[in-house]
Amino acid sequence: MPKASDIKKNTAIEYNNNVYIIRDIERSVPQGRAGGSLYRMRMYDVVSGSKIDQTFKDNEMLPLADLVRRNVMFSYIDGEQYVFMDNEDYTPYNLDKDSIADEILLINEDTQGLQVVLVDGAPVALELPSSVELEIVETSPSIKGGSATARTKPAILSTGLTVQVPEHISTGDKIKVNTAEHKFMGRADK
């Protein structure tokens, strides 16, 4: 059983006899009192979809729920549902657009390393690899000699996400984006 300080985003825990998926974690260190950090977690009930915010002490033990991760590929959009296909047995998994709103801006048909998180056989979350490769569809023209300085410019990617890129990067380039911070990491390997 891990401590609250060891819990990561998209972890499933059992709390008050329900299974919740952790969508967001904020760490705070209270001033003027002894003790450790506090972790405020935004959790969604995997059955009803209801949201709760709960605060835990850093050393509080949280029981993990039984979950399974399956490697998948993004397949298609069906209304408000995003459909992912299991890489091994081709089982389709539907995830609601709202439940994966943060991840949508980082996936396309070519994204590799996606995993669907299943609790009791039902898909509840999508886990991204640490980085994804996306194409720049719009940015200001590249500046000759721009690699000599550390200045950046905004670039709109094929998924609609906007990231800051170095001035020498141009429209049409494929870049690596850090999925946790939504930041430019470098040019993608050709």
Swiss-Prot record:
SMART domains: EFP, Elong-fact-P_C
PROSITE patterns: EFP
GO molecular function (one): translation elongation factor activity
CDD domains linked: S1_EF-P_repeat_1, S1_EF-P_repeat_2
Gene3D superfamilies named among the record's database cross-references: 2.30.30.30, Nucleic acid-binding proteins
Database matches in Pfam families: EFP, EFP_N, Elong-fact-P_C
A GO BP entry: peptide biosynthetic process
SUPFAM superfamilies: Nucleic acid-binding proteins, Translation proteins SH3-like domain
Family according to the record: Belongs to the elongation factor P family.
GO cellular component: cytoplasm
Superkingdom classification of source: Bacteria
The protein's name in its UniProt record: Elongation factor P-like protein
Organism: Psychromonas ingrahamii (strain DSM 17664 / CCUG 51855 / 37)
InterPro entries reported in the protein's UniProt record: Elong-fact-P_C (IPR015365), NA-bd_OB-fold (IPR012340), Rib_uL2_dom2 (IPR014722), Transl_elong_fac_P/YeiP (IPR020599), Transl_elong_KOW-like (IPR013185), Transl_elong_p-like_YeiP (IPR011897), Transl_elong_P/YeiP_cen (IPR001059), Transl_elong_P/YeiP_CS (IPR013852)
